[in-house]
Amino acid sequence: MEAHVPFDARYLAFLETITQLRPRLHRYCSRMTGSVMDGEDVVQDALFEAYRKLDQYDDSRPLGPWLFRIAHNRCIDFLRRRGVRVEAETTAMGPDSVMPATPPVLGVGRAVEQLVMSLPPKERACILLKDVFDYTLEEIAELVGSTVGGAKAALNRGRSKLAASPEPVKSHREVNAELSRLLHLYVDRFNKRDWDGLRELISADAQLRVVDRFAGPFDESPYFGNYDRQRVPWRLTVAEVDGELAVVVMRQHRDEWRPDSVARLEVIDQHITRIVDYAHCPWVLPSASSMVVADCP
């Protein structure tokens, strides 16, 4: 979605109608892209594309498959733009992947989601759609733009590769020292409510996107004030989410601090140039394949 797209009443009403589908769309896109944040960005683009094409939608057919088709195409576009190849995809769950201290027991579907990252996009899509989302071969063929025979062949190839694949090898991704330094400084000043000090870290032309709420110049937003007014106690921390350094918002539940939401910061020339906050997307952070908290309070 473009940076200055207004969240008008009609678009927000459209989002309201597909509320139940969004977590499933995100789950699919995050496994296709290898990142819960990239996955949500792709979903956002797909939903805005769907909104613009509503006049082309045949309302006699289910809405879900139509949205999945758009989201799938956006995932493929994303992978092509990034030049993602199999070698890179095998590390997409992050270096030294560490699950939270008390990870949930994974069902078959969730386990499959984590394993398919080693597969090429078409095989990955077919396995996710069949084994996780329970689509028929006919539906899968339509979603991925293939024949039933082609979808079945991709599904069988993917399953064979997964059955023969060894345990994934943990790898180490080079840490961006500049990003790490700025994120820790950002978190420290944010937790101290040092708003003036934070503004020193942010470039004059920085962009802010609070998903589903705001998209535009940072200096035109009430971002800091919105956090300052929140009643539920919160703290920020630096964490690796799906292998990417990010800012995680921790919220206090009784005597325990729990991860609640995530924000991605982009840095150029020692200044923060873009912030994407997923605070209003509660399905994003729980979908992460790995999260390593650097300085949990």
Residue ranges of model-derived segments:
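Short, basic/polar amphipathic helix motif occurring as a linker/hinge flanking DNA-binding modules
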Residues: F78-T102
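A short pre-motif secondary-structure segment
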Residues: C126-I127
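Helix-turn-helix DNA-binding module
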Residues: P121-K122, F133-G150
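Short, small-hydrophobic-rich alpha-helical interface motif
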Residues: L25, G39-A50, I70, I140, ...
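Sigma70-family region 2
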Residues: F7, Q44-L63, R81-V84, S165-P166
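A short, charge-rich alpha-helical start-of-domain segment used by transcription regulators
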Residues: A3-R27, M37
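Hydrophobic-face residues of short alpha-helical interaction/recognition segments
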Residues: L25, C29, L67, A71-L79
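Solvent-exposed, charged amphipathic helical/linker segments at domain boundaries
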Residues: E138, V148-T237
